[in-house]
Amino acid sequence: MCTGCVQKQYPDRGNTCLENGSYLMNFVGCANCHQRDFVLISDRTMVNEDEEEIVTYLHMCKNCEHVIARHEYTFTVVDDYQEYTMLCMLCGKAEDSISVLPDDPRQTAPLF
């Protein structure tokens, strides 16, 4: 992974977890060829293991194929919640949890 290609390493993205794509606002340009062009996605893999889906791929420079960052996205269902995580030097780090129930018990306000 290349620290010279990104503005900030692993920026906090809150609950924005990307299964695909690139966070171009954090891309300053390729440290190898000094071009700021589109970022390619390469070597994308999807693995389903023990109720967990893991997607990994490489962000690469369009011009010289320099590896900018490795992206990892995970999806699991734990109890009544869908759990998402993302970890990537370019796209950042994020976590999200969404209830699979019609009404999220965590959002229920106490009556008294």
UniProtKB/Swiss-Prot annotation:
Lineage: superkingdom: Eukaryota
Classification via InterPro entries: Churchill_sf (IPR038543), Transcrpt_activator_Churchill (IPR009508)
Binding site for Zn(2+) 3: H59, H71, C88, C91
One MF annotation (Gene Ontology) recorded for this entry: zinc ion binding
Pfam families: Churchill
GO term, biological process aspect, one: positive regulation of DNA-templated transcription
Record's keyword annotation contains Transcription: yes
Induction: Up-regulated by FGF signaling in embryos at mid-gastrulation.
Protein name (database record): Protein Churchill
Organism classification: Eukaryota, Metazoa, Chordata, Craniata, Vertebrata
